[in-house]
């Protein structure tokens, strides 16, 4: 294909918005043709039995799509919209409400599945956890962070596991001189795949640390607990500091027979399936027919993400997605004149949805 337009590339959720738009517009059109509520038509067509095998390899393992729809409808007072619409019309305004339900395939994998579709690489992820003699932890990951907050979330994972301050955890990524081979950050896979590789490495580190502690404290491995920066024997007052166990691993003066010195482990993780978050978004707008001005009255986002590691980062991701969607729907466009000249070549002409334009939205 030859074109004189400027090159473009995906910046988030490549292909998914277009596919979702098509499906949701079909649902809206069908509801109007059938004379039924768009919400109830969606509800009647939700998948309710799991696991659900799709025609394209993937199997939905679990989901409660009615819950997110009901939550969004309640938060937006969906049933009260006709009254609000009538009130707007009394002022000469036009008011509309729209909803969109989605299911997303995240954590792109497993390698065998994508290989059958023609992928030239495996889609596992790797990690290495290095515990230093003083008890600080260094995590090397193939999942690169470019705004997703890996440094915070990954450090929080280690902090919660061993009871260490996050300042004692260093996340290393993006340096090919240090980090072992990884499959990268895309397809919403850093948490589901990248963090799972870290967890597998942490499991090995914890198991070895407990063996060392059990040997030093003359206790059973099954009785060893690690919490709050201490390694203790359950039901007793016998304990060691986390740093003491780490130092013992490296001095190697008193290790179990046959154990190698050090406290460093690596792991690979190749998931058996994708993960499938889902949700429902409802937007209510008011339009001034005289000027064309659009006001977003409210925007409700109800998402089912499963277990959330850091709610603040996840909420920020949702806010960013809302801003991008609003910008794409109302403002942003690459416009060319009849001679093929790009007329939206600067921020003076290409409108972006900015933080000062964003209002308060509901998120749950």
Tell me the role of every PLM-derived stretch.
Residues 1-67, 74-355:
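Cofactor-binding beta-sheet edge motifs in enzyme active sites
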Residues 353-364:
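Single conserved hydrophobic/aromatic residue that forms the stacking wall/gate
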